[in-house]
Amino acid sequence: MYKLLTKDGMAKRGEFETVHGTIQTPVFMNVGTVGAIKGAVSTDDLRTIGTQVELSNTYHLHVRTGDKLIKEFGGLHKFMGWDKPILTDSGGFQVFSLAGLRRIKEEGVYFNSHIDGRKIFMGPEQSMQIQSNLASTIAMAFDECPSSVADRDYMENSVNRTTRWLKRCKAEMNRLNSLPDTINKHQMLFGINQGGVYEDIRVRHAQEISELDLDGYAVGGLAVGESHEEMYRILDAVVPHLPQNKPTYLMGVGTPANILEAVERGVDFFDCVYPSRNGRHGHVYTNHGKMNLFNAKYELDTRPIEEGCNCPVCRTYSRAYVRHLLKAKEMLGMRFCVLHNLYFYNKMMEEIREAIEAGRYKEYKEEKLCRMAEGE
């Protein structure tokens, strides 16, 4: 259940109660696609750096380890040693972006695995069944993820199908949560708003899915090629039509600047691979912008990645040492960068929550963006 604590303009400060603990929002979910953050980051590390929610992916866990095996283990929480909330993506985005030879039917999608080419079928019921086996805290509804350049007629048909699929997801989750062998009988369901950059289709879809009284609502199909301005325009149009007494989740977004702008528009949940992906390539986030530690100017730099940062890396190690590890292709260097980046994001969300509580979110956002744009 979502509890709105306070607002500053459209920015919301809330709490979301789940069977695995209360989530303080706005929140950034750390992405562990197959049950682990890429970059040799453990669940103990996640606890140390203040992670509230871990995100894993239904499609990847289904085609690799297998959700039935994970259910036998007692669910994803026990499997990966994590006792806080987990959100599982429905697999829809991966089916439409990774899998080959897709055939979209009313019943679902027929496709070939991107791992071994085997034929797989996934529809709303199958996605819910897999996520129930994983026993995640929050399950995402199975949706179609049309191309951002899809024409209007296709987008309207796609959105209508996504609504029908959402109703089937809700019915199947209710059925699964009533079964005696279901691990998490309190699994929550978030629906997903689609519609590309067509503002009127987005708004109509938001109004339709809001009537289904779900646990939360996501805005999907953004950050897939459109400009930042288009993304913010869609958020301005859509978020006011989603229930204000439920959390709003902007999927796959994004940069620190994206998050700061979206919070101001009323978004509560975020996820993105940027902190870990960039960290694995030696790019680290700081309050003065992004740094490339491969740059020669850091070769003898005795300072931490960011002075004043309390992450496990900055408390002990210098830029020069982390750069040395990266240049030597030591996994420790990659791990250090990922840890720092995730800590930076988690800390930024803490600052965001404090700024909303203090009624100075707009000032905080402008100061943060200005500092990050200045560079070192």
Residue ranges and their predicted role:
Residues 1-15, 23-32, 39-40, 143-149, ...:
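C-terminal extensions of enzymes
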Residues 21, 54, 89, 131, ...:
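Conserved, mostly hydrophobic/aromatic
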Residues 163, 172, 176, 184, ...:
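Glycine-rich phosphate/ribose-binding loops and adjacent secondary-structure elements
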